[in-house]
């Protein structure tokens, strides 16, 4: 699989369906590999081959098989996650963090505007600190970033936790 899904989706949702309809047994008759998509459509600098690829498999052997496939086309290299769930969670955190950071800057921009403070100037000043992560007010962008926090919230509620800041 190569998509953005919540942690557990491949093994808890997809695999049972594959087993049911194929009559095959997971990790005996068939295996799964997962690598979240990490492309940035339209970005000429960060192309598919120049972005390190997180890869995983349902067994160490499958992880190596998936790795051997991707290292042929990904010049930036790969990162072997210890499990499919870790790889799924890595992608969700990437997009959820971006969504939340832009939402925070949007809200701060509204506050600063009401105080007659130029947000761009504030950001330029804040960027002088080595560990400040700059984000600009605006739309989140991307086809999946805005929906990924909902995937994580869905899974969180299924395991009995209601997130406080994800949405």
Where does each model-flagged region fall?
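Structural/interface elements that position substrates and couple domains in central-metabolism enzymes
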Residues: 1-167
